[in-house]
A protein has these predicted regions:
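Hydrophobic alpha-helical transmembrane segments of membrane transport and translocation systems
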Residues: 28-29, 195, 201-274
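Transmembrane alpha-helical segments that form the functional core of multipass membrane systems
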Residues: 32-120, 130-134
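Loop-to-transmembrane-helix entry motif
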Residues: 10-13, 58, 175-189, 228-231
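Short helical (or helix-break) motifs at transmembrane helix termini and adjacent helical loops
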Residues: 143-159
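Pore- and gate-forming transmembrane helices of large, multi-pass membrane proteins
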Residues: 147, 168-202
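Hydrophobic transmembrane alpha-helical segments of multi-pass transport and channel proteins
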Residues: 99, 141-148, 182-187, 223-243
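Juxtamembrane helix-boundary/capping and inter-helix hinge elements in multi-pass membrane proteins
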Residues: 159-169
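Short juxtamembrane and helix-loop transition motifs at transmembrane-helix boundaries
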Residues: 2-7, 21-33, 52-60, 158
Length: 274
């Protein structure tokens, strides 16, 4: 005979309520862009579940990781911004930066040795611990890198279209100023997100007598690595995005430079005549 007992309250109504508030607020504030944002969220969640099932079925995890990063970048930026030069530039900037982070991570491990992956909170098994952690690091910083990439490419696009006589030197100076503004905020956002994720376990272990040095060495070292790798990605995304954007808009810049040079020449000629 099958029997059961009540062991707790069913709290999924609260989650459904929050989802409802989120959808209503997003559509009310952003309109059509909010609907596109919801489409990207749904597509990325479905793709993430599919990629996890591929890994469970025995597929190569690094190949899955590469496909996942490409899919997230392409789908998110194309659905939200459409097929345009600035979005293609943002996609290329994101992928170049992400795979640069991957290469730097591998080079660092080759010189310093492997991390103690057995100290992670949840271990899926004895194999692929390094790849699982690396995948989490790359996916974790992907959003920040995408944000920086689309910001820089959009800024270059707007500057070239709005200021017809802007020179390459002026454009690079503007990109540098934009990069300074977004780097500081994005790095702090990344830090706060990782602090929020590990705050409960940190407080719990401090209450139970863990000292701060032991906590950093054995418990939050992985969070620190995630933050540092993501911060390097944000910093790297600014010059990479700038180079990609300048290459994509170089035809416009050459015309702009010639216009600026012609304007300077006209001014010089008029001054000589005077």
């Amino acid at each position: 005979e099958l029997s059961g007992s009540i062991i707790g309250l069913k709290r999924d109504k609260f989650i459904v309520l929050l989802i409802g508030f989120f959808v209503i607020a997003l559509v009310a504030v952003a309109g059509r862009f909010g609907i596109f944002t919801l489409c990207t969220l749904i597509a990325n969640i479905v793709a993430f579940i599919y990629f996890i099932k591929l890994y469970v079925s025995g597929k190569d995890f690094m190949l899955i990781n590469v496909l996942m990063i490409i899919f997230f970048s392409v789908v998110t930026l194309l659905i939200l911004g459409g097929f345009s030069r600035k979005n293609i530039g943002a996609i290329l900037s994101t992928l170049i930066t992400t795979f640069l982070i991957f290469a730097l991570y591998k080079i660092s491990l080759a010189y310093t040795g492997d991390l103690h992956y057995e100290l992670m909170d949840y271990i899926a098994g004895p194999n692929d611990l390094e790849n699982i952690f690396l995948s989490g690091v790359l996916v974790g910083c992907l959003g920040a890198v995408m944000d920086v990439s689309i910001t820089v490419n959009s800024a270059v696009n707007e500057l070239v279209n709005a200021a017809k006589s802007i020179t390459l030197k002026q454009l690079i100076k503007s990109i540098r100023e934009i990069g300074h503004d977004i780097m500081g905020t994005m790095i702090n956002v990344l830090m706060f997100s990782y602090i929020g994720g590990s705050l409960s376990i940190v407080i719990l272990k401090i209450i139970n007598g863990y000292n701060f040095q032991r906590l950093i060495q054995f418990d939050i070292s992985f969070e620190i690595i995630r933050f540092l790798v993501g911060a390097i990605g944000i910093v790297s995304a600014v010059p990479i995005s700038a180079c990609v954007a300048l290459l994509f808009f170089r035809k416009g810049m050459s015309k702009n430079d010639s216009v600026a040079n012609n304007s300077i020449a006209d001014v010089n000629d008029s001054s000589r005549r005077r």
